[in-house]
A protein has these predicted regions:
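Right-hand nucleic-acid polymerase module
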Residues: 1-108, 118-200
Length: 200
């Protein structure tokens, strides 16, 4: 995944004369919050593309009745993930997951989403039986760049950020460090010239 962008930042090459960053003074503005959300979405898109293939399971698990409190939801979610790990160990695979809990503080019922590698149909039934508080719906992840971006956008959408827990990722996910390269002024120009309309 390659991203090219222009930067208006101009910094001296010498570390001695670089201006130090000022201490944080103001609360994050709405504009900056949106910038932060987009960065989280881009990072999550890369993580999804690097760890999941087409056919991976996108699981949504719901509550038939609204739970008593947030702590109960977190405890039941943790128990569900422990069961998932056991199912995957028995299948000879690692449970590599990305998950989020939605509507923890909202008026509706909480529910969770988790992206995890696919197993067999029998294993899918075991996973559905492991969640004893409501329905378990399984959809297949498409595997393309647009699929990853759409899923990352949903996981990081403003509604989830405002009324839910943080995105959780398993420790065994592959995380290739981002490689940044500085593009010179000459390299930033278009390689092929495009004549104005009406000219050849």
């Amino acid at each position: 995944m390659v991203k090219k962008y222009y930067s208006y930042r101009a910094l001296p090459t010498s570390k001695k004369v670089r201006e130090k960053r000022a201490k944080r003074q103001n609360v994050t503005t709405a504009t900056q919050a949106e910038v932060n959300r987009r960065l989280r979405m881009e990072n999550l898109t890369r993580l999804i593309m690097e760890n999941y293939e087409a056919g991976a399971w996108y699981i949504t698990y719901t509550y038939s009745e609204k739970p008593t409190d947030e702590k109960a939801v977190l405890a039941e979610d943790a128990k569900f993930k422990r069961t998932l790990r056991r199912i995957y160990r028995r299948a000879g695979m690692e449970a590599r997951y990305i998950s989020v809990l939605e509507n923890l503080k909202g008026r509706g019922r909480p529910h969770g989403h988790i992206l995890i590698p696919a197993l067999t149909v029998d294993d899918m039934e075991r996973i559905q039986k492991a969640w004893k508080h409501g329905r378990v719906q399984v959809k297949l992840y498409g595997g393309g760049a647009e699929d990853a971006a759409r899923m990352a956008a949903y996981f990081t959408k403003e509604k989830i950020d405002g009324s839910s827990g943080r995105i959780q990722t398993s420790r065994n996910l592959t995380r290739t460090p981002v490689k940044k390269e500085r593009v010179t002024r000459s390299e930033a120009y278009r390689e092929e010239s495009t004549p104005p309309r009406g000219y050849r």
